[in-house]
């Protein structure tokens, strides 16, 4: 091993240690954080109310789902049953299916249960989008075409591109920022891994944001970057004058009558910046209520929570921008043909999924420890929801 290689590796280890990635990878798994990462993180509590809404169980449970065969476009699952797929290679912990406001399928594996919290990772981005829509409705954020520096004026001195970057660019992953999402431990990916590690485990996220560079002009292309949702979360806090957890509690968790409190990771007690990009942990049943809100076009039991227009812009089927709008997906993101009854979904690493199909009045939630085929779970849910039994 030559001297240059030793110096590079030493610098890498020191940098990783400085942002606690070694602690993170030991605690959360050797290839990134796991669904119980909140147990090792500083976090804020998202309080719920005192009158919870509970989904009733349907008289007729959909037991036929376990034996239904489906065909996946990927190489891992050519022809298999749902039960085989979920218990085989994906390490699923729980699946919940709700139709017409009633639970028709609920199953848990291992020590997971209905009242156990799990980190939903990038599903948090979709919840951050919901909060942004509420802030727009309330006039705290004037318009999604406002530039970022209207809310983070300290960035004006950093790079002229900041004054071209809009909230819409953040919502649609068109920021132009030089940031890559990766959990690869290969040395050639060190620079990108280090940036992602700082986002997950660093103690001063605003310092990381101030140090960002641009690789292209905002709005030029779609490129998935967790940092964009983190910046959006900071904007929401600045615009509302509220901590993320408090605003989410008041505007979503309490009005939606969540059964349990949730939590969101923060960078540190000193700086108290929420992990808006992927730090929310909650129960499956409460996550399903976000789906119910979107299914009902922003209305919860007769009360308007967010505008129908915001829901429309987030979820209407479109093939541009890789099927991604306002932090929600449709299956055109993987090149799948549009089904007769298309849904939309929020997606987190390791296959955390909140899927909604408005045509079938369906909500599906999956929590798991891995998903070896990208978008396999959403694809499975799309196939399932288009089955004639629904």
Locations of regions flagged by a protein language model:
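Bacterial Sec-dependent N-terminal signal peptides
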Residues: 1-27
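Active-site SXXK
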Residues: 101, 119-144, 170, 232-236, ...
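Active-site-proximal alpha-helical segments within enzyme catalytic domains
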Residues: 228-235, 276-299, 352-368
């Amino acid at each position: 091993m030559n001297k240059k290689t030793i110096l590079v590796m030493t610098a890498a280890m020191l940098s990783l240690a400085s942002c606690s990635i070694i602690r993170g990878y030991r605690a959360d798994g050797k290839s990134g954080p796991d669904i119980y990462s909140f147990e090792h993180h500083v976090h804020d509590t998202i309080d719920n109310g005192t009158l919870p809404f509970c989904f009733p169980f349907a008289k007729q449970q959909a037991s036929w789902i376990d034996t239904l065969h489906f065909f996946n476009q990927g190489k891992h699952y050519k022809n298999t049953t749902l039960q085989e797929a979920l218990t085989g290679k994906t390490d699923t912990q729980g699946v919940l299916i709700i139709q017409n406001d009633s639970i028709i399928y609920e199953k848990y594996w291992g020590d997971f249960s209905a009242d156990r919290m799990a980190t939903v990772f990038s599903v948090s981005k979709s919840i951050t989008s919901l909060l942004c829509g509420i802030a727009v409705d309330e006039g705290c954020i004037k318009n999604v075409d406002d530039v970022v520096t209207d809310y983070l004026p300290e960035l004006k001195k950093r790079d002229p591109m900041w004054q071209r970057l809009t909230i819409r660019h953040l919502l649609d992953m068109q920021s132009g920022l030089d940031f890559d999402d990766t959990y690869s431990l290969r040395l050639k990916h060190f620079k990108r891994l280090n940036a992602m590690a700082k986002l997950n485990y660093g103690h001063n996220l605003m310092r990381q944001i101030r140090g960002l560079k641009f690789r292209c002009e905002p709005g030029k292309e779609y490129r998935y970057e967790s940092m964009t949702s983190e910046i959006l979360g900071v904007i929401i806090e600045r615009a509302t004058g509220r901590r993320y957890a408090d605003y989410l509690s008041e505007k979503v968790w309490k009005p939606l009558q969540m059964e349990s409190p949730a939590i969101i990771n923060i960078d540190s007690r000193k700086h108290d910046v929420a992990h808006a990009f992927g730090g929310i942990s909650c129960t499956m049943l409460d996550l399903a209520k976000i789906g119910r809100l979107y299914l009902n076009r922003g209305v919860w039991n007769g009360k308007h929570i967010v505008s129908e227009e915001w829901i429309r812009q987030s979820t209407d089927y479109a093939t541009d921008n890789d099927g991604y709008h306002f932090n929600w997906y449709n299956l055109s993101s993987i090149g799948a043909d549009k089904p007769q009854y298309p849904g939309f979904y929020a997606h987190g690493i390791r296959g955390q999924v909140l899927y909604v199909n408005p045509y079938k009045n369906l909500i599906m939630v999956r929590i798991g420890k891995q998903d070896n085929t990208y978008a396999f779970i959403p694809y499975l849910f799309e196939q399932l929801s288009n089955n004639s039994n629904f």
